[in-house]
Every structure is written in structure tokens, then in C-alpha cells.
């Protein structure tokens, strides 16, 4: 069912395409990007933003959220049926920041959702352009992955908070389609499934009746998506068992938690896409660049080239470090929240620090924050090299995972070892052999035990000079093998709260 994901490239998922050749894919992804850019230009005109204000990432986020909210059919229907005081279900808006007399001021804007939908469709040749909406969702998800640690969500479902490298895409809305499913980490899928099973345990009617039938179909579909991410037969077999369970309960939760842990070493295949804020696409379109004609790919050199020439600004709070804010956004743009810091640093050409060492909070500014002391600065989003994004998880002959975060989920297809603290990971498996699946469990544990942290993944793969667009001369970096690099290592990042 969902394993079609493996048959179609991300770009096809991203553009709802049937099988297309590379040129058609590049054109349809380009069309999607161009549509986002045209929409953004039009919104900047509507809001009377000058060029600098239009390149402010906080304004971009507000405009992006407005269009996502305008197209959120289920929520819109819900809001109309359950009117809440002071909220107009037909309107959407948010904070827009402008320079007034040398100071940044916050202005709350409100628009008819219908009007936003009209502007979006007009920018996308009359289409709803769902692919473009999903692209924006994935950019927001990548930014969340880089900014917040999902410890609380993990602990609530009985998982280890150190498993955060499995949590890519954990804030993606359910409606994000195949492209969204492709970028979700193993932990994210496990979390969604456990939440579902817990509801079934607490609510007798959850699996019953007409609604229950739909619930069951959704459950099996999510199981298949997760199964498609695993790369070993034993993990896939355990997923079949979870999916076929007559009445999913605690045994399934145990199996899923076991599988999530196993993914720290036997990593799943999780797609990585470079999704940029709308304020990058807008100015590019405005300068006359034709994305559809030139073609575009989310996993190749194109996003790197675009970021090399883009000017993006950000508001900075009084005690924040602009360089650290830049790193946060750079990681989000490159979908590198769970990549090894050694690799990210090499590609970026400047040292990438773990989250706990960054003096910066999230990009968005809360409505109750005082604007008086807030300044703006240029985000440094350029890179020294570029590398191909991977979907493989980087397992050598079926295994691999690093410490603190206790694992990584590689973003770039670049040769390195993927160090992991085996004792920490294996400790989680001792003595837990009850459950019906001990043969599969034994097989999975055996594969994990034979994994060696020093083995090299992505053999022979390297980074490329930005001028080397055809990827002809790979530069294979050499890393200090002993030094592992996890972003959330020993961390104090804020929690993500919806």
C-alpha cells in the first residue's frame, strides 16, 4: 500500500505525479516552487511590504501559515461547527513585522480565507496545488525538528527521550500526503501508531462501526508506511504482525517500542528534502528566474545554489547570537536536524554546534514579546560544498547508529562512519524477550550486536564544489572516527508545544 513510496522518487510524491522521467519531474517540482514564489510576491504586495520586510523570515512564516490555514478543510469545517468566542472561522492572519522610524513593529493582520485561497490558486494557474502546500508543511516541520527536542512526546508514549534522531517530521500535519509520509522518521510513525492503539484501549468503540472501519484502514496504512521504512526482513515481519493484530493492544505497543529502539542501529529509510521558506522563492521569481523552465530538484544542487544567492533576514532578540540563528535556519533549510555534525560542518564550511550550545530561541516571536529591543540581521545560509540528500539511513550491510542523541539519521550521502554508543542502546534490550515474537526479536538483536560503530557508510560518496553541478568530482572528507556528532547531545532545547 504505502510502500509505493519506494517506487516513486520524492519529487513525484511531492507533485502527485505518476511515473515521470527526470526532466518532467524537475519541471513539475519547478512549477510547484514557482507557484509558491508567485503567491509570496502577491502577498507582499497585498501587505504593502518593502523588499527588506518581504525577505524577513518571520513575515514569511506568517504568510505560509495563513495559506496552510486557509486550505485546512477539516479544521475549517470544525471551526464552523464549533464556533469559539472571538475567532472568526472564515478569517486567518498573524503577526507581520515592519520597520517604522528605525524600529521593528508588530502588526496583526486578518484576511478572508477565501481571499487567500484565491491568491494561491491564481499563483498556481488555477490549481489547488496541494504539492506546494505540502512543501511548505515540510519546511515548517524541518524548522521544528531543528528548533525543538521532542522529549516530552517521547516520554508520554513510553519511549526513551534519547531516541530523538528518529523523530523527523513529528510535527507534520496528518494531511501532508505521500511526500509528508516519506520524510517522517521511524519514531514519528511509531508514536502515531502508539497513540492510536492507546485510544483503542481506552475507547471501546474506537475500532467499531463505520468509523472504526475507517480507523482500521488508517491503522493498516500507517503500519505499511512504517514497514516500508525498515530495511531488514525481521523488522518488516514484526510490522506485518503489528498490522494484522485483531485487536491492537499492549503487545503491539511493546513490539513498536522495540522496533523504534532497533532503528537506532538498523536505521530506517527516511527521505530528506531541502524545503526553503517562501521568502527565498519569491525574490527568485521576482528577479525573473523561471523555475519550471529551468527545472528544480529538492535533493540535488538546486537548493544550495538558490541559498548561495538569497538574502534572508531575521529578527533577533537582545541576547541571541545572529550566527547561531543562522545555523538553526541553515539546518532547517537543508533538513539536517539529525545529521552528524561532522558532516554538516564540512558541507557548511563553518563549525555546526550542538543545539545546547546555541544562544538562540526559535525563529517565531510570541505575540507577548516586547518588540522594543528587537533588531534584525542577515541570515548566513550559504554553504562551502553541496551533497546529495539521502533516503537510505546509511546502513552498511544491514546495520549501523551515535551517543547522547545515541544515533543519527543521515541527511547527506557522504562517506563516514556512523558512531553509536552500543552499550547504551543494547542495554535497552536486555531481559526483554517476552512477547510472541522472540524469534524475530532474537534475529534483530543479533544483527544489532554484530554492528560495529567504526564501519563506513556511503562508501566512496563525497561532497561536491558548488560549481560541480553535475556531481562529477566527489570530494570524500575524512572525519575523526572517534568524534561523534549529535545535534541534540546533552541538550536543553525547548519543548515543542502545539
UniProtKB/Swiss-Prot annotation:
<dbReference type="GO" id="GO:0042025">
    <property type="term" value="C:host cell nucleus"/>
</dbReference>
<dbReference type="GO" id="GO:1990904">
    <property type="term" value="C:ribonucleoprotein complex"/>
</dbReference>
<dbReference type="GO" id="GO:0005198">
    <property type="term" value="F:structural molecule activity"/>
</dbReference>
<dbReference type="GO" id="GO:0019013">
    <property type="term" value="C:viral nucleocapsid"/>
</dbReference>
<dbReference type="GO" id="GO:0019029">
    <property type="term" value="C:helical viral capsid"/>
</dbReference>
<keyword id="KW-1163">Viral penetration into host nucleus</keyword>
<keyword id="KW-0946">Virion</keyword>
<keyword id="KW-1139">Helical capsid protein</keyword>
<keyword id="KW-0167">Capsid protein</keyword>
<dbReference type="GO" id="GO:0075732">
    <property type="term" value="P:viral penetration into host nucleus"/>
</dbReference>
<keyword id="KW-1048">Host nucleus</keyword>
<keyword id="KW-1160">Virus entry into host cell</keyword>
<comment type="function">
    <text>Encapsidates the negative strand viral RNA, protecting it from nucleases. The encapsidated genomic RNA is termed the ribonucleoprotein (RNP) and serves as template for transcription and replication. The RNP needs to be localized in the host nucleus to start an infectious cycle, but is too large to diffuse through the nuclear pore complex. NP comprises at least 2 nuclear localization signals that are responsible for the active RNP import into the nucleus through cellular importin alpha/beta pathway.</text>
</comment>
<dbReference type="InterPro" id="IPR002141">
    <property type="entry name" value="Flu_NP"/>
</dbReference>
<dbReference type="GO" id="GO:0003723">
    <property type="term" value="F:RNA binding"/>
</dbReference>
<feature type="region of interest" description="Disordered">
    <location>
        <begin position="1"/>
        <end position="21"/>
    </location>
</feature>
<keyword id="KW-0687">Ribonucleoprotein</keyword>
<dbReference type="GO" id="GO:0046718">
    <property type="term" value="P:symbiont entry into host cell"/>
</dbReference>
<keyword id="KW-0945">Host-virus interaction</keyword>
<keyword id="KW-0694">RNA-binding</keyword>
<keyword id="KW-0543">Viral nucleoprotein</keyword>
<comment type="similarity">
    <text>Belongs to the influenza viruses nucleoprotein family.</text>
</comment>
<protein>
    <recommendedName>
        <fullName>Nucleoprotein</fullName>
    </recommendedName>
</protein>
<comment type="subunit">
    <text>Homomultimerizes to form the nucleocapsid. May bind host exportin-1/XPO1. Binds to viral genomic RNA. Protein-RNA contacts are mediated by a combination of electrostatic interactions between positively charged residues and the phosphate backbone and planar interactions between aromatic side chains and bases.</text>
</comment>
<feature type="compositionally biased region" description="Basic and acidic residues">
    <location>
        <begin position="8"/>
        <end position="21"/>
    </location>
</feature>
<dbReference type="Pfam" id="PF00506">
    <property type="entry name" value="Flu_NP"/>
</dbReference>
<dbReference type="GO" id="GO:0043657">
    <property type="term" value="C:host cell"/>
</dbReference>
<feature type="short sequence motif" description="Bipartite nuclear localization signal">
    <location>
        <begin position="198"/>
        <end position="216"/>
    </location>
</feature>
<feature type="short sequence motif" description="Unconventional nuclear localization signal">
    <location>
        <begin position="1"/>
        <end position="18"/>
    </location>
</feature>
Amino acid at each position: 500500500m504505502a510502500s509505493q513510496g519506494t517506487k516513486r522518487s520524492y519529487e513525484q510524491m511531492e507533485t502527485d505525479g505518476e511515473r515521470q522521467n527526470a526532466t518532467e519531474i524537475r519541471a513539475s517540482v519547478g512549477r510547484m516552487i514557482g507557484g509558491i514564489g508567485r503567491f509570496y510576491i502577491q502577498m507582499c504586495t497585498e501587505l504593502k511590504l518593502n523588499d527588506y520586510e518581504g525577505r524577513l523570515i518571520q513575515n514569511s512564516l506568517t504568510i505560509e501559515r495563513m495559506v496552510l490555514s486557509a486550505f485546512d478543510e477539516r479544521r475549517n469545517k470544525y471551526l464552523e461547527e464549533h464556533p469559539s468566542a472571538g475567532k472568526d472561522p472564515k478569517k486567518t492572519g498573524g503577526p507581520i513585522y515592519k520597520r517604522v522610524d528605525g524600529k521593528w513593529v508588530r502588526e496583526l493582520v486578518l484576511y478572508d480565507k477565501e481571499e487567500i485561497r484565491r491568491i494561491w490558486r491564481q499563483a498556481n494557474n488555477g490549481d489547488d496545488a496541494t504539492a506546494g502546500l505540502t512543501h511548505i508543511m515540510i519546511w515548517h516541520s524541518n524548522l521544528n525538528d531543528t528548533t525543538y527536542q521532542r522529549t516530552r512526546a517521547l516520554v508520554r508514549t513510553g519511549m526513551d527521550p534519547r531516541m530523538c534522531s528518529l523523530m523527523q517530521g513529528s510535527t507534520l500535519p496528518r494531511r501532508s500526503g505521500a511526500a509528508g509520509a516519506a520524510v517522517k522518521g521511524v519514531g514519528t510513525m511509531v508514536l502515531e501508531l502508539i497513540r492510536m492503539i492507546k485510544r483503542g484501549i481506552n475507547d471501546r468503540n474506537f475500532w467499531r462501526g463505520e468509523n472504526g472501519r475507517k480507523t482500521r484502514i488508517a491503522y493498516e496504512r500507517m503500519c505499511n508506511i512504517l514497514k516500508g521504512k525498515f530495511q531488514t526482513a525481521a523488522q518488516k515481519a514484526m510490522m506485518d504482525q503489528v498490522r494484522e493484530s485483531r485487536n491492537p493492544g499492549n503487545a503491539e505497543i511493546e513490539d513498536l517500542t522495540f522496533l523504534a529502539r532497533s532503528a537506532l542501529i538498523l536505521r530506517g529509510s527516511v527521505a530528506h528534502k531541502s524545503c526553503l521558506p517562501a521568502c527565498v522563492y519569491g525574490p527568485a521569481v521576482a528577479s525573473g528566474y523561471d523555475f519550471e523552465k529551468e527545472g528544480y530538484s529538492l535533493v540535488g544542487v538546486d537548493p544550495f545554489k538558490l541559498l548561495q544567492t538569497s538574502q534572508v533576514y531575521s529578527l533577533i532578540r537582545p541576547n541571541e547570537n545572529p550566527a547561531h540563528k543562522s545555523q538553526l535556519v541553515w539546518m532547517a533549510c537543508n533538513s539536517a536536524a539529525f545529521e552528524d555534525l561532522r558532516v554538516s560542518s564540512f558541507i557548511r564550511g563553518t563549525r555546526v554546534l550542538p543545539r545546547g550550545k546555541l544562544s538562540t530561541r526559535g525563529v517565531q516571536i510570541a505575540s507577548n514579546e516586547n518588540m522594543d529591543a528587537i533588531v534584525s540581521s542577515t541570515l548566513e545560509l550559504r554553504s562551502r560544498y553541496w551533497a546529495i540528500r539521502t533516503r537510505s539511513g546509511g546502513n552498511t550491510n544491514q546495520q549501523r547508529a551515535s551517543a547522547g542523541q545515541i544515533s543519527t539519521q543521515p541527511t547527506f550521502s557522504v562517506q563516514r562512519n556512523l558512531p553509536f554508543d552500543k552499550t547504551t542502546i543494547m542495554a535497552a534490550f536486555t531481559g526483554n524477550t517476552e512477547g510472541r515474537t522472540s524469534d524475530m526479536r532474537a534475529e534483530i538483536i543479533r544483527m544489532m550486536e554484530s554492528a560495529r560503530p567504526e564501519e563506513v557508510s556511503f562508501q566512496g560518496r563525497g561532497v561536491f564544489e558548488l560549481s560541480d553541478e553535475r556531481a562529477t568530482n566527489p570530494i570524500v572528507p575524512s572525519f575523526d572516527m572517534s568524534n561523534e556528532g549529535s545535534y541534540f547531545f546533552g541538550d536543553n532545547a525547548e519543548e515543542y508545544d502545539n
